[in-house]
Each structure stands twice: as C-alpha cells, then as structure tokens.
C-alpha cells in the first residue's frame, strides 16, 4: 500500500494574503484541490492523508475533500508548530503502508511520472526525492557582500517533493530526530541523519511550489498551458 501525505498546514507569509496559500483559488479552484487531484488520479496511490491547521480541518473537509469527491482521502490531521511536527502527525495517522510520499500542498504541478518514479526508487533504495539542477550560477557570498567562490552547479540539486520513503524507515528516522531534538528543513535531511541514503531523481521545473505572488502568476500561466482541470 502506498500513502500520500499532503502538507497543508503552513501559512505562507510570503504570499502576503490573509488566508492559507493552499486555499487560494486559481481559475475558481483551490491550489490544494489541484494537488490532491494528482494523487487521487494515480493508480499507485491507495490512500491520502492531509495535514492541515486545526482551525482549517473542517473547511478542508467540506470545501475540498467532499466538494471534489476525493475518496482516497482517509484522514485529515492537525499540524504542529513546525513542519517536522506536522509530518510526524501525518506519519502517525498512517494505518498501513509500504511507501509514503510526503508532498507540499502548494505544489500542484507534480505529474504521474514523478509519483511513479518516487515509489519505484523508494522501494529500491529506501528513500528518494525528486528535484532539478539549478539553472543559475551559484556563488558563496562573504559576510561583507563579496563573492568568495563559484560552486559547480552540476553537483547541486534543488530538492522538490514528493519525498518518498519506506514507511517504517522514515517513521523511525522522525522518532529518532524527535528524541535527539533535531530540527531539520525537510524529510530527506531527517532520513540522512539516521544513517540512510536518499536517491535523487529527476523532477520538473514545472513542479514549482507556490510561495510568492510571482509563483501564483507562474502557476496561472502553467494552468492555462497544461489545461489542468
């Protein structure tokens, strides 16, 4: 069984709106609904768990899950004060799974190939994450504002989601991080801190996370281009 955990508890202050960015409408439909739909349509996903702010759980259930008939959504759980705690709450809500895919609710352009490859590589290696190589030249900047070094971008990788893992392994890694007081920026970091390796595979430049007003404009353009419904 494969379970997708959709992270939708973040506020997104950089969007400069008075609502959760995942509930912003694009062509009359919430961003989160587009995201969930990608996993709803995947034949490899058996169930979906949404992690939302406690105050928004009822709205999420009524205005997204019921409204768009997402019958693979089995539970909506409340998030924690940090993303790491929110993921842990989502993992604890999983009743039975071989592979879990942890995905940003504000990343609606994930495609089925990315989902399929994530499951395939997680089964093979234990952990996998999609992403892309940076397009820009990357510099190390000194404290006084000058360039210190140019990084070989062929060795760099901008990690996206989904981040996919064998369920027992990522749960154990999160438990270890919690016990040791480790606060990580994403789940690959937590997985690696437990002595595991993460296989990195090709994502897509279109698999953007909607974080700023500019991202929202780009998403609207992509939506028109791809005719996502």
Swiss-Prot record:
Pathway: Isoprenoid biosynthesis; isopentenyl diphosphate biosynthesis via DXP pathway; isopentenyl diphosphate from 1-deoxy-D-xylulose 5-phosphate: step 2/6
MF-aspect GO terms: 2-C-methyl-D-erythritol 4-phosphate cytidylyltransferase activity
Sites annotated Transition state stabilizer: 14, 21
One protein family per Pfam: IspD
Site keyed Positions MEP for the nucleophilic attack: positions: 153, 209
UniProt key word Transferase: yes
Annotated Gene3D superfamilies: Spore Coat Polysaccharide Biosynthesis Protein SpsA, Chain A
Keyword line: Isoprene biosynthesis, Nucleotidyltransferase, Transferase
Catalytic activity entry: 2-C-methyl-D-erythritol 4-phosphate + CTP + H(+) = 4-CDP-2-C-methyl-D-erythritol + diphosphate
Family label: Belongs to the IspD/TarI cytidylyltransferase family. IspD subfamily.
PANTHER family: 2-C-METHYL-D-ERYTHRITOL 4-PHOSPHATE CYTIDYLYLTRANSFERASE, CHLOROPLASTIC
Matches recorded under HAMAP family: IspD
Name of the molecule in the record: 2-C-methyl-D-erythritol 4-phosphate cytidylyltransferase
């Amino acid at each position: 069984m494969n379970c997708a955990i959709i992270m939708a508890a973040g506020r997104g202050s950089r969007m400069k709106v008075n609502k959760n960015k995942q509930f912003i409408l694009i062509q009359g439909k919430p961003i989160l609904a587009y995201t969930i739909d990608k996993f709803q349509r995947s034949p490899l996903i058996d169930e979906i768990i949404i992690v939302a702010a406690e105050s928004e759980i009822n709205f999420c259930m009524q205005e997204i899950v019921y409204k768009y008939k997402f019958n693979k959504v089995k539970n909506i759980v409340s998030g924690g004060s940090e993303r790491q705690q929110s993921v842990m709450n989502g993992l604890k809500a999983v009743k039975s799974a071989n592979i879990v895919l942890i995905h940003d609710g504000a990343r609606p352009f994930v495609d089925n190939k990315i989902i399929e490859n994530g499951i395939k590589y997680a089964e093979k290696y234990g952990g996998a994450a999609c992403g892309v190589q940076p397009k820009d030249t990357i510099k190390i900047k000194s404290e006084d504002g000058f360039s210190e070094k140019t990084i070989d971008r062929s060795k760099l990788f901008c990690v996206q989601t989904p981040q996919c893992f064998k369920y027992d392994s990522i749960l154990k890694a999160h438990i270890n991080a919690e016990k040791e007081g480790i606060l990580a920026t994403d789940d690959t970091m937590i997985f690696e801190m437990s002595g595991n390796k993460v296989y990195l595979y090709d994502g897509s430049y279109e698999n953007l996370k909607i974080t700023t007003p500019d991202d929202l404009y780009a998403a609207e353009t992509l939506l028109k281009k791809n005719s996502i419904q």
